[in-house]
A protein has these predicted regions:
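Phosphate-interacting basic helix/loop segments used at nucleotide- and nucleic-acid interfaces
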Residues: 114-118
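DUTPase catalytic domain/fold
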Residues: 150-151
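Structured, hydrophobic secondary-structure cores that serve as assembly/anchoring elements
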Residues: 1-100, 105-107, 120, 126-142, ...
């Protein structure tokens, strides 16, 4: 009731002309979990909006050490391999925007990778409402049981929050599939996840990217085996220049010696040639030594092999911002990706897309003339008519969270007809706008959705007495045309 007016004068009263409205929540705000170059405070979610901001807070990644052995491909030292920084670069290259980072430790060789670190980070994320996607690229660096535990915990976390989904990476996703269940990477992946499947999606295989460039690679990645590389380079020189006095051979051997020479402690004396810098040594060896070029190329190629989850989070962001969350994130390319690590044919994708157990894995494939495309849009719950498609799961989350946030304004309001009408109209207006944007299917709004609330329809008198206001929302969501069948038939000549 308005305050009593006793003093003569003019009084102004403002009356709201419009009811509350539903505001659409963000749909593509990933949360990344992993090891960072710097860890200001572990397990504290931090919001960033660009790669520059990420670097300023968390730093870059230390160099991965590689082992050179004659006659063998160079191999990374597992303790020095971390994926989050490169994955963040792939995320932003594919259209990524604001996101959350949960550092679980520093990316140094002394760090012991542990599944518990990831689980603790998921617990910390429960306090943050904004993220809608959970990604953990470094989880594939754990052993298989550790990876399985983290993947299952990610799905359980999403089920608990009901406001986000997980993008999972296939463990050892660079491996070609086999016909043996005990060794097939997809079968092992499916066996490792069991519950809350509609909140997860996975992609296979991993991808060869162009994230790490030639200018970022040099011989410092081989610190522990540089002497072995020098031996190989010396043998290469001896084979190319049998005459030990050949000036070209001597010059190249001097370069080889410079690889392992300790850095100078003082400037050269007058008349002495300047000591070449590491950059000069690297560039010179790239120009003259096929073996050195091959080793550097192998290092770059291995650093550029990444699990696709972070890139897919960027694709989700790009699709959501340009087309809408209701558009399936498929039949689109991945930026900074050269090729999938494993080539998949249409027949090979049959089991990936529609297995008997429903645990669909979306394929990343190369098509002639079209490049690398994401060729699948299913969740891990492929046997569910409700939750088979990624865009359906994510659209429902958006609708649920948007309406939930708007309905908070009516908690403790009178549980009466006037409130029911207001809530129904508020939700109906929101869904009408979604229908106009293409998120719902129907020739008119009444065919696309319905909103029911009130005594005798969604509530009983007992519900009202106990403080319940039940609202039922039904929506007809857009589903992707996954299989387009075109039938051709010949007809008789008519003239």
């Amino acid at each position: 009731m308005a305050a009593a007016i006793k003093t003569p004068g003019v009084y102004v009263r403002e009356i709201n002309a419009f009811p509350n409205s539903v505001v659409e929540v963000p749909t593509a705000v990933p949360a990344f979990i992993g090891y960072t170059g710097k860890a200001p405070v572990p397990n504290v979610p931090t919001r960033i909006s660009s790669l520059t901001e990420y670097i300023s807070i968390f730093g870059t990644a230390p160099k991965t050490n590689f082992k050179y052995q004659k006659g063998q491909p160079v191999a990374p030292v597992p303790a020095t391999r971390f994926l989050l920084y490169s994955s963040m670069r792939l995320f932003f290259d594919n259209g990524g925007g604001p996101c959350w980072i949960v550092s679980i430790g520093t990316s140094t060789p002394d760090t012991q990778k542990d599944a518990k670190h990831f689980v603790d980070a998921l617990t910390a994320l429960e306090k943050i409402q904004e993220p809608t996607i959970v990604v953990a690229p470094d989880a594939v660096l754990l052993d298989r049981p550790g990876w399985q535990g983290v993947s299952q915990q990610m799905l359980a976390h999403c089920n608990k929050m009901q406001s986000r989904v997980s993008i999972l990476d296939v463990y050892e996703g660079t491996t070609v599939r086999t016909n043996t269940d005990a060794t097939d990477v997809i079968t092992l992946f499916r066996n490792g996840i069991t519950d809350f499947l509609n909140y997860g999606q996975a992609y296979y295989p991993w991808v060869n990217t162009s994230i790490t460039e030639d200018s970022e690679i040099d011989f410092s990645y081989l610190d522990d085996t540089l002497k072995d590389l020098k031996t190989g380079l010396d043998e290469e020189v001896t084979a190319a220049f049998p005459d030990a006095n050949d000036p070209k051979g001597k010059a190249q051997k001097d370069l080889n010696n410079a690889l392992v020479a300790p850095p100078p402690t003082a400037p050269p004396k007058p008349g002495e040639p300047p000591v070449p810098t590491p950059t000069q040594i690297h560039r010179s060896l790239v120009a003259v030594s096929p073996l050195y070029r091959s080793v550097m190329e192998q290092i770059k190629d291995q650093l550029n092999v990444l699990p696709p989850s972070a890139g897919m989070a960027g694709v989700y962001t790009r699709i959501d911002n340009t087309l809408g969350v209701f558009k399936a994130p498929a039949n689109t390319g991945m930026f900074s990706v050269i090729s999938p690590c494993v080539d998949i044919t249409g027949e090979e994708q049959d089991d990936l897309n529609a297995p008997l157990n429903g645990k669909a894995v979306n394929a990343i494939r190369t098509f002639v003339g079209r490049g690398v495309l994401i060729w699948g849009a299913r969740t891990l719950d492929g046997n569910s008519q409700d939750w088979r498609y990624i865009n359906v799961r994510r659209t429902i989350i958006m609708l649920e969270q948007s309406i939930k946030n708007a309905a908070l304004a009516y908690v403790f309001e009178a549980n009466s007809a006037s409130t029911w009408v207001t809530v129904r109209n508020m939700i109906a207006n929101f869904l009408t706008n979604q229908w106009k944007s293409g998120a719902l299917v129907g020739a008119k709004p009444e065919e696309a959705f319905s909103v029911d609330v009130g005594l005798g329809s969604t509530m009983t008198a007992d519900d009202v007495l106990n403080g319940f206001m039940n609202v039922t929302v039904k929506v007809a969501l857009v589903r992707p045309a996954e299989f387009i069948v075109i039938t051709f038939q010949q007809k008789m000549q008519t003239s």
